[in-house]
Amino acid sequence: EYSRIFPEILVDHSQKKLSEEKRELSARWSASVIITTSVRFFESLFADKPTDCRKLHNIANSVILFDEAQSLPSDLATATIQAVNTLCEKYRCTMVFSTATQPDYQAIEGARWHPTEIISDSKSLFEKTKRVQIEWRLNINDLHIYRSDFCAIASEMARESNICAVVNLRRHARELFHALANLVRDSGALFLLTTDLCPAHRLEVVREIKRRQRLHEPCIVVATQCIEAGVDLDFDVLYRALAPLEAIIQAAGRCNRNRRQTFGKVVVFEPLDERRAYPGDSYERAAMIVK
């Protein structure tokens, strides 16, 4: 997509095979437009190998856009923001953080984070673009989220024709998928999308889901967080296992995405699991704050 707009563009990430000429250019980022990953970018700033640091002079005086900025690791937030500030103050860079769920970096002590909003009244914009209604499965008496087993969730999902469930663990995704497989007659309508699949296979699955949605064919998807950002799919109903608020919002972005109805439906539930139900301690702490 970018190459149709910019005449000179260099794509540099671990899964991209480069020609000898492009490999030499990528070592120094000698191009007017660079498409890379946040990992590769920060490696160029923090690496202890000279080969990784040869890009710094070309980073200076640049406009740097971080898409889906909320995905930057929270445990490295202090170092990340300090590096960003240094590039702005010492190297005359301009940073743009693009996301629907902007982290509160100002809360980090000593972060020196003073961004300028590009949109003057972002709250009003969010109100105008509201597309979903969120159902929090709460017990009004004690404000605890009902803990749902996957068989019950599968039974509800099987009654829908265009629905997705996003869970926190691959183990949960497999369990829900197998529960649905016993209920859904059309096996071609059922999809599992996790990082157990290689990137090429995930892309193939996404393309098939898009094809079925375009033809208004039944589509029931079980996925992990790999579907939350940058995946252009549109579901009428979306179930989201309890997670940090930004993850719930990102998942909700896959519901009623194209405004085919007034409001889509997002259901937040807590899985019934006696074992560890979250991918990491910081993720679990953030989910408990939401709860």
List where the protein language model places each region:
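Conserved strand-helix element at the start of the C-terminal RecA-like helicase core
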Residues: 1, 156-181
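A short beta-strand element within the Helicase C-terminal
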Residues: 222-250, 264-269
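Conserved helicase motor
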Residues: 10-22, 39, 168-171, 190-207, ...
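Inter-Walker segment of RecA-like/P-loop motor cores
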Residues: 4-46
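Post-DEXD/H (motif II) to motif III coupling segment of the RecA-like Helicase ATP-binding lobe
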Residues: 52-63, 70-125
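Conserved two-lobed SF2 helicase motor
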Residues: 28-48, 212-228, 240
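Conserved segment of the helicase C-terminal RecA-like domain
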Residues: 217, 250, 254-290
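Interdomain hinge/linker at the junction between the two RecA-like core domains of SF2 helicases
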Residues: 100-158
